[in-house]
Regions:
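Periplasm-facing N-terminal accessory domains of Gram-negative outer-membrane beta-barrel systems
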Residues: 2-111
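Short helix-loop capping/hinge motifs at secondary-structure junctions, enriched
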Residues: 221-222
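Periplasmic N-terminal accessory/gating domains of Gram-negative outer-membrane beta-barrel systems
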Residues: 44, 50, 70, 75-90, ...
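Membrane-embedded beta-strand positions of outer-membrane beta-barrel proteins
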Residues: 225-229, 261
Length: 263
């Protein structure tokens, strides 16, 4: 059996009026702006709603409507891989014509959905971060538990690496690099990376210590692309440590070209 890891996000929340009374059967419409993907939900008897299986990233726009209340619109929401975004909204009655309606959404710092130490690295961060080797091992250093490919003092060979839910592991311990035996995919193809350490989430299974969960980019309604040139040579390596001369550096040059196109 193959157990896929988490490849989606979720959103949940509560809708109430200014008196704190639950609003039942309010329509919640969530739109993924880059692709136009739409998700719908209806609040239950407690005024709560939830949507599972959503695309990671964003931006998302949330519109909440109910008879007798002004529409509530919340924009520029970004979802993290494997996390539930909590959005609590207070709606304003629309008895008379209003010049302006201000809707305030809150998100608790203490989420019951947290299931362990997690670090999410978004596509915006992946684009901005410098990387010497253009590999996952450079990126996961953003996790405070990371030491190379090992986490919380564990051996890097026990780290679980999944891409779009599929395991890419070095099960026989024959590789000295990633659990999958090297960089399995171009960094430009990755949409988001999640680093988890000893999670107690039943969806994250079949490993001990640390897990790296990555998802690739998917199509949108906008045609776009990226391009890069990665160059490394002996002039970028030092030949002296303190006062010790390590000798002349040998020729060691490597140039990698790459590009992506999608829409």
């Amino acid at each position: 059996t193959v157990n896929a890891q988490v490849t989606t996000s979720a959103m949940a929340g509560h809708v109430a009026d200014k008196q704190g009374e639950d609003i039942i059967s309010a329509l919640v419409r969530v739109v993924h702006k880059p692709s136009g993907t739409t998700y719908n939900a209806v609040t239950n008897v407690d005024g709560r709603w939830a949507i599972q299986g959503m695309r990671v990233g964003g931006p998302y726009e949330v519109k909440i409507t109910y008879v007798g209340f002004a529409d509530s619109v919340i924009e520029d929401i970004t979802l993290q891989l494997g996390e539930t975004y909590n959005l609590n909204v207070t709606m304003t009655e629309d008895i008379t014509e209003l010049g302006e309606v201000v809707v305030t959404g809150t998100r608790s710092k203490f989420a019951a959905e947290k299931t362990g130490a997690t670090t999410n690295i978004s596509n915006t961060q992946l684009t901005a971060l410098p990387t010497v080797s253009r590999s996952i091992s450079d990126i996961v250093r953003l996790s405070p538990y990371a030491n190379g490919m090992g986490f919380a003092g564990g051996d890097g060979r026990s780290t679980n690496f999944t891409l779009d839910g599929a395991n890419l592991n070095n099960n026989f311990g024959l590789s000295s690099s990633l659990p999958g035996g090297g960089t399995p995919i171009s960094m430009d193809a990755i949409d988001e990376v999640q680093v988890v350490v000893t999670p107690f989430d039943v969806r994250q299974t079949n490993f001990i210590g640390g897990g790296i969960n990555a998802v690739t980019k998917s199509g949108t309604n906008t045609f776009k692309g990226t391009a890069y040139v990665y160059h490394n040579n002996e002039n970028m390596h030092g030949n002296r440590i303190d006062n010790a001369d390590l000798g002349e550096r040998g020729t060691n040059r490597n140039t990698t070209y790459g590009f992506t196109l999608g829409g």
